[in-house]
Curated annotation (Swiss-Prot):
PROSITE patterns: FLAVODOXIN, FLAVODOXIN_LIKE. Keywords: Electron transport, Flavoprotein, FMN, Transport. Its cofactor is FMN. Low-potential electron donor to a number of redox enzymes. PANTHER family: FLAVODOXIN 1, FLAVODOXIN 2. This is Flavodoxin. NCBIfam families: flav_long, PRK09267.1-4. One of its GO terms (molecular function) is FMN binding. It comes from Chondrus crispus. Gene3D superfamilies: 3.40.50.360.
Amino acid sequence: KIGIFFSTSTGNTTEVADFIGKTLGAKADAPIDVDDVTDPQALKDYDLLFLGAPTWNTGADTERSGTSWDEFLYDKLPEVDMKDLPVAIFGLGDAEGYPDNFCDAIEEIHDCFAKQGAKPVGFSNPDDYDYEESKSVRDGKFLGLPLDMVNDQIPMEKRVAGWVEAVVSETGV
């Protein structure tokens, strides 16, 4: 069973989460806004998690996102042992408007879930993007899938479909 969890500011992250759900079909439960998660332990019931977040860390607060992920990552997730649960993270950003912190949300989610024992999967090649800096790049890879719904010349559906296929192949789920 595959779970898809996200937060959104403008609806773009919802659109991507819905597309991931459509791509996975019956393998996945319907996407859930992280705001609606009442029992964080329920995430352990899944064989694979897709986690999505909108742009954040735009200079106001470099530690917290200002989205519903904040409460979940820092108040709920620390109670959960995610031992070896594969998590694939997608983040939405604006490489032209915020080129110095492109999709930084991926890094925050990655680190919080990894700290709880989850196994992050689905890393991406940063050479496929035009940006200045991102905390979400480590060892030459994005820690998930960055998406720029405004400036990217590659359609979201094409990027996401290929990434979902790669994640499913990588995890065997």
